[in-house]
């Protein structure tokens, strides 16, 4: 049975993305803005398009995305992770290709907490000999 919409949730750092894939001509809309307007820099656009390019469905599916939290890098990673999960619902045979490129793995690195007595997570106060 062919569905008209495929859903995937992606997370990275403190960003969370909800991705809906539909049949279309390759448009990517993020929070009601085009990909070029939401991410003007090319490096983030490449990260987002990578799952679609690896599976050769860039011009077949449209992506409608809502993303909240985090910064631009975390949001781009969350969107990429969400697109990957939605592509698996679209076609489970993509799993080996996506796994080989490292797109299926959730990047679990988070910001380290600030410790008491330190200026940052690991940065100690300036040392004065005298």
From Swiss-Prot:
Q: Does the keyword Transmembrane helix apply?
A: no
Q: Which domain of life is it from?
A: Bacteria
The region annotated as signal peptide is none
Q: Which Pfam families match?
A: Ribosomal_S9
The GO biological-process annotations, alphabetized, read as: translation
Q: Mind telling me which Gene3D superfamilies this protein's record contains?
A: 3.30.230.10
Q: Name one GO cellular component term.
A: cytosolic small ribosomal subunit
- Which residue ranges traverse the bilayer? none
The protein's GO terms of the molecular function aspect are: RNA binding; structural constituent of ribosome
Question: Which UniProt keywords are listed?
Answer: Ribonucleoprotein, Ribosomal protein
List the HAMAP family. Answer: Ribosomal_uS9_B
Name the PANTHER family on file: RIBOSOMAL PROTEIN S9, SMALL RIBOSOMAL SUBUNIT PROTEIN US9M
* Membership in a protein family: Belongs to the universal ribosomal protein uS9 family.
* NCBIfam families per the UniProt record, alphabetical: PRK00132.1
State the name under which the record lists this protein.
Small ribosomal subunit protein uS9
Organism field: Blochmanniella floridana
